[in-house]
Amino acid sequence: MIRAFFGRVLLALAVLFAAVPAAAHQQKLAISTVSINPRTDRVEIVHQVPLHDAEHALRHGGVHSPDIVSSPESREAFADYVTTRFPVRIGDQFAKLTFVGSEVKGGSLWVYQEMPVPEPSQTVSINSQILTEVWARQENRVNLGGGTAVRTLIFRVGDGFKEAGLRR
């Protein structure tokens, strides 16, 4: 009886530890930075998404074998996906974000976008829903500004637009 008990405990531990590496690849966190570049007078938007999460999102969207590290097509597909999941509004109009590029650095895919700086009187609102349709516990952080004046907005599944308050 004791042997059977320890056998079950060992089996349960083996199953638990086997699941940990699979879960470790899913970080469920995307970080975006939105700041004004005074040299170019453009709003720069940078998204950092863990590679495994980005590839999982592409598989979820129907891409059979995504390979973000070595496939420009996979990187472009994820960049297209990001543009649909990160809308920006200026007043009541959707802003046109320009895709600048993407690259793999470390364990993340970085996607770069930009747009013109809105007038100071205009309200800028953001809604980051990157990966929220893939994982219910996804959290997206949007850092606004730069230097020592950074403000962070946190988005989860189902959240609406939040005012960004960009400052020159």
Protein language model regions, located:
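N-terminal soluble domains immediately following signal/targeting peptides that reside
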Residues: A24-R168
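Bacterial N-terminal signal peptides
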Residues: R8-A19
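N-terminal secretory signal peptides that target proteins for export/translocation
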Residues: M1-F6
